[in-house]
Amino acid sequence: MKILCIFLTFFFTVSCGPSVPQKKTREVAEKKRECQLVRGACKPECNSWEYVYYYCNVNPCCVVQEYQKPIINKITSKLHQK
């Protein structure tokens, strides 16, 4: 009975959550998707008319230089006093 309890504890501890390779695969897929959203491509090296947006796994995400990164402006509201 004690062995069964130890086995079940080990089994449930090991089986919880995704394994490390699954997490890595998911992260790589997310980075490739983000790269495609900015009209880029993950490839071994960028051409002269492209720049590195960020790295997908080990390869750079190459984006054409015409693409501008979005500028985030803070929206501030001021109350007008009369």
UniProtKB/Swiss-Prot annotation:
Has antibacterial activity. Residues 1-16 form the signal peptide. Its main location: secreted. The gene is DEFB113. It comes from Pan troglodytes (Chimpanzee). This is Beta-defensin 113. InterPro entries: Beta_defensin_dom. Belongs to the beta-defensin family. Keywords: Antibiotic, Antimicrobial, Defensin, Disulfide bond, Secreted, Signal.
